[in-house]
Amino acid sequence: MKEVLVLALMLVLIAGASYAEEIKEWDISEMIHPQLKEGLKRVPYFELNSETLGFLREVLGGDFSQLPKDEAVDVRNETLPSGLRVRIYTPKTGANEYPGMLWLHSGGHIAGSPEAEEWLLLRLAKGAGCIIAAPYYRLAPENPCPADIEDCYSALLWMSENLPIRKDRLAVGGASAGAGLAAAMAQMSRDKHGPAICYQFLLYPQVDFVNDYPSHHQINDSRVWCLSLHLAALKWYPADFSGDYVSPALTEDLSGLPPAYILTGTLDIFRDEAVSYAQRLMQAGVLVELHVMPGIVHACEFLFPNAPVCVKIMDNYTNALKEAMK
């Protein structure tokens, strides 16, 4: 019931937003979910600039080999003829075929790696019983857009042809920037008559680089992904933001796209664009399961994976993915 009320409020805010008056920043220390308040106090403030970008990349793309593995999931790397590397997670169930999902990692298009999210991918592969292929797509600014989009689509084509995946159960998913890329893959595959996509699994999606939303300005606390970090990342992501598939929310025709699971939080900087995109998908006849979680910041489970509310969020979307993969 709380999610329904929150969603109704968000739709009113988006529909009636006026930018004639300055939008006030919110104090997330007071508004964050009670279970996350103490944890937030331990998160340092972060400034993204040319000096700290290297640190961010090291944190999100470093050596994770010492982290715990799951004996129920096989993990290996493959290299495509193009040189693109893909990390593959396969449940050890002995099946001849599996549902499959292309997973696109977060990191603002400028950082990140599959290993940084391996703890989650192991959980999803095991819990949903699906093969997950996660490409090391090229990052900006060294590789300007659409390099990332091209790599993601190449990985989608490759996995559909080379992995033991059921042709009727191929999903696309991701978190944050990766969720935006996943939404783009669903559109791109539809338009190019590529692999049939059965499901969009979009966590905290960033889908609109062009339009301004109230949530962009309300969330500007740099302990979480916020306006200042978002604007800094944009400087290193040179792109025609209105170009094909860069901002999936700008696509006029959303009909014929696969069902979508969309997760955001009331304290997520991308909250309003996620809700707006969900609304437009529904208007186009697409089945959408939308969750707007009260008091939740952007990618909260990445920051507080052991908090009960975050565990519940992960359990919920793992179960949703499992149902979609049947």
Where are these predicted regions, by residue range?
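Alpha/beta-hydrolase superfamily serine-hydrolase fold, recognizing
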Residues: 23-326
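Sec-dependent N-terminal signal peptides
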Residues: 4-14
